[in-house]
């Protein structure tokens, strides 16, 4: 079962199609992870702290909920006499939540889990990770009260790295 079908029922968005992501993680690193060892990868964009090593890097997309309001109007008009019309009606605002997909780069180091993107990026220490749910095409990471839903080309390998680090 995919992450989108679990979260949104049938999966998919009306405005934002599910991105098809091509992995950038080297095959040698994937083989090393599946054998139970953590590879050390070079990260050109991520600034590593002292003593920090990058063990996983891949393209990803984060799913965030975007809430906006739509107006609903209804009413009627009644002609009382010639030139006299009575109008009645009301307007209500209805909240509508849609999913927004943002592409970026997902890193797992020995100290942090980082998603770098133009919007909705995050960086959390691994010790604050409280739950990980893996799906066929993504991961759901919970850090105390904040949950991040990510689409990944190889979610199983990312989950394996997190399991090796925790």
Regions found by a protein language model. Name each.
Residues 76-82, 110-117:
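Short charge-dense sequence patches
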Residues 3-103:
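Anionic N-terminal interaction surfaces
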């Amino acid at each position: 079962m995919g992450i989108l079908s679990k979260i949104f029922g049938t999966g998919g968005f009306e405005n934002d199609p599910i991105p098809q992501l091509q992995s950038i993680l080297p095959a040698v690193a994937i083989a090393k992870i599946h054998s139970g060892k953590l590879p050390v990868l070079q990260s050109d964009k991520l600034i590593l702290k002292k003593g920090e090593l990058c063990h996983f890097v891949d393209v990803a997309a984060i799913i965030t909920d975007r809430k906006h309001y739509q107006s609903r109007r209804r009413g009627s008009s009644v002609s009382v006499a010639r030139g006299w019309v009575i109008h009645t009606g009301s307007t209500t605002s209805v909240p509508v939540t849609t999913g927004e997909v943002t592409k970026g780069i997902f890193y797992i180091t020995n100290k942090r889990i980082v998603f770098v993107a133009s919007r909705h990026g995050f960086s959390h220490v691994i010790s604050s990770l409280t739950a990980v749910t893996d799906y066929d095409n993504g991961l759901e990471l919970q850090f105390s009260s904040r949950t991040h839903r990510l689409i990944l080309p190889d979610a199983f390998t990312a989950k394996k790295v997190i399991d090796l680090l925790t």
